[in-house]
């Protein structure tokens, strides 16, 4: 099979190497618009469930990712200097460029051709192939030009900026700071021994009130460094652009009624996005391409394979999309919860995946005192982009039981 992958992110690279592992005779080319060694963003976060999938699919690249990943432990919620530590949280962060390098090297070792600096504006630019896999992100040109996928895009109301810093956060940290214009907070986690991802978020009203809409980008970074001075310990905030700046954005939630048309198929952010506050983007993109590769192997006809892939992945996305929507809404309504005591606020932050939160007064959502019948159902199974509730001991890849969260 001749395959063109548009986009050299984790989804495109992993799909290509999986196809080569299944059938070395496949002719697979990745077209990546950026130069080799350049990427957007800083690092990505993930948990054992993704690492288990990687080990099951390709142990060699999984070991490299495992070895390169930064392991953070615990979760810290810091509201104006008052901290609540959740000791049941742990996960992984990895430098995005390091992740791409591992996957690109593995794909090329297997015979995949990667063409950098090759922007594909429309499928008609591509050579004649049997399958075009659109892994070109939320702004997918392939999705726009290839057919009617019935795409829907919803713009979140909060503003956010994706930054990096030399401060290494050993725990996944949510610092909340109050300003005269409202609350500003961050999602911070280590990605290697020298740096962390630091995503800043606030309401549009706070963003405008603080002047981010008019001040030069470098002045904006300086203001953020001042606001988070206590958490950064003197370290700078750095943007993704060569000049060190980065754009403020509104998150775009993308859904598609159809994931394929003819020989064109969507995967990763081109097919769907889930709000960054649940930290599932990379996991879901990898899940897409694992399913796509499996269906292409198991079905003799392309249309049957793509139909089965679409059905499986749309069903798999229902729960994380719901959790992401609720998580985004929780942060968009931060004023509803922020005046609670820090431990109460932290409890609801970790339980924000509950559909009850928007509809009941916050005090009714909190766990009942001991002896009063146990905890409220809204907080029995915390779900967040940084934590989940502790479960029973389960076997790991090494065969040693440990708690998952």
Label each residue range with its predicted role.
Residues 1-3:
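Extreme N-terminal starter segment of soluble prokaryotic enzymes
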Residues 5-21, 133-134, 247-326, 330:
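Conserved mid-domain beta->alpha element of the FAD-binding
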Residues 48-162, 367-383, 403-404:
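Conserved N-terminal helical subregion
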Residues 11, 36, 139:
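Conserved Rossmann-like nucleotide-cofactor binding loop
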Residues 35-53:
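Conserved N-terminal glycine-rich FAD pyrophosphate-binding loop of Rossmann-like flavoproteins
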Residues 20-41:
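Glycine-rich FAD pyrophosphate-binding loop
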Residues 105, 118, 128-251:
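Conserved FAD-binding catalytic core of PHBH/FMO-like flavoproteins
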Residues 6, 21, 62, 67, ...:
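C-terminal helical "tail/cap" subdomain of flavin- and related membrane-associated enzymes
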């Amino acid at each position: 099979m001749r395959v063109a992958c548009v986009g050299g992110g984790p989804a495109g690279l992993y799909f290509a190497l999986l196809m080569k592992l299944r059938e070395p005779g496949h002719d697979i080319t990745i077209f990546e618009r950026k130069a080799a060694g350049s990427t957007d963003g800083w690092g990505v976060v993930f948990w054992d469930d993704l690492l288990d999938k990687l080990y099951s699919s390709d142990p060699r690249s999984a070991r490299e990712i495992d070895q390169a990943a930064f392991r953070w432990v615990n979760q810290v919620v810091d509201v104006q200097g008052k901290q609540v530590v959740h000791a049941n949280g742990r996960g992984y962060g990895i430098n995005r460029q390091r992740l791409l390098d591992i996957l690109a090297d593995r794909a090329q070792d297997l015979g995949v051709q990667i063409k950098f600096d090759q922007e594909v504006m429309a499928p008609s630019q591509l050579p004649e192939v049997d399958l075009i896999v659109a892994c070109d992100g939320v702004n997918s040109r392939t999705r726009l030009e290839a057919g009617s996928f019935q795409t829907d895009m919803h713009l979140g109301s909060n503003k956010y900026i994706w930054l990096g810093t030399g401060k290494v956060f050993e725990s996944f940290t949510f610092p909340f700071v109050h300003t005269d214009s409202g609350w500003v907070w961050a999602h911070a986690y280590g990605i290697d021994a020298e740096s962390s991802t630091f995503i800043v978020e606030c309401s549009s009203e706070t963003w405008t009130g603080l002047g981010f809409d008019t001040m030069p980008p470098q002045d904006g970074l300086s203001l953020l460094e001042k606001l988070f001075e206590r958490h950064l310990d003197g370290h700078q905030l750095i943007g993704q652009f060569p000049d060190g700046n980065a754009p403020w954005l509104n998150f775009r939630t993308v859904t598609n009624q159809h994931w394929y048309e003819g020989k064109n198929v969507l995967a990763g952010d081109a097919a769907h996005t889930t709000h960054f506050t649940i930290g599932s983007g990379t996991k879901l993109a990898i899940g897409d391409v694992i399913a796509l590769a499996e269906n292409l192997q198991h079905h003799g006809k392309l249309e049957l394979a793509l139909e089965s892939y679409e059905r499986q992945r749309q069903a798999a996305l229902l729960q994380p999309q719901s959790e992401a929507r609720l998580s985004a809404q929780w942060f968009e309504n931060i004023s509803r919860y922020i005046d609670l005591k820090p431990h109460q606020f932290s409890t609801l932050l970790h339980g924000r995946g509950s559909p009850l939160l928007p509809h009941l007064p916050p005090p009714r959502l909190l766990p009942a005192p001991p002896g009063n019948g146990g905890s409220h159902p809204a907080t029995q199974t915390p779900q967040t982009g940084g934590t989940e509730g502790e479960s029973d001991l389960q076997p790991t890849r090494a065969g040693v039981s440990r708690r998952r969260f």
